[in-house]
Amino acid sequence: MAKRIVCFGDSWTYGSDLVDPALVPVLEKEGYSVQDAEYKYFHKNLPYREEHRYSNILEKELGIPVDNLSEQGDSLIGMRVKFIEWMHQQPKDCPSTLVIFATTAHERYSFYSAKDKQWLHSGYLQYGGMHHPLVEHWKRHLVHSSSPELHDYTLLDFVMTTRALCKEHNMSWIYAPVFPMNSHGRIEDESVTEWSMSDICRQREMEGHKVWAWGEHPNELGHKFIAKHLISFMKERKLIQ
């Protein structure tokens, strides 16, 4: 049974667009959009974002520690490296640890900047949210290297690596795709959820619930629904009591 959970993922796991309502009028008065809270008031909004994302809801509901090691815009490439680095710091035998991989679109790409000591993700390259001397070079690389075969390999490499390391360290794991599986590759594993996080939110939206935040991310209620589905899945697999 899990006594600790660790989450890896992209902006959905990070809690993007979860903004403290008290900051909304401040941002509007200063001429910023609500989505600018992450950059203009990072430290002020941090407690609110962390409290309302699904990982913290899991921690409260299950009464066990949950570490969130996600990053906005992350790719399977970036998540894979972060997981390996984290794994090197763990004991050889971790039977009470459960890892949740909130897998993202397999066509995403990440470059590591040794100078900046951070990952630079293709989403920011494509939408102009990154300023770096090598941006034009990376854009050219993405155009000439993108292919269905490469994307499928990226997903396969991620799944095989993470699964093998979890088995080696006697950890449990879950693959919980953010997007519908058939749209971004399919994971063949007994520990993958039959639903995606976006499926959950769209279904609840059809039922009349307001589940979306300011951008294309779940709001506080959306994160509650995601946590509820994860808990049900964990109980079905007897990963938690």
Predicted regions and their residues:
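Serine-esterase "nucleophile elbow" of acetyl-processing enzymes
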Residues: M1-G78, F225
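Alpha-helical cap/lid subdomain in secreted, periplasmic
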Residues: I84-Q241
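Short, glycine/acidic-rich beta->alpha junctions
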Residues: E50, M79, T154, F158
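Outer-membrane beta-barrel proteins
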Residues: L76-W86
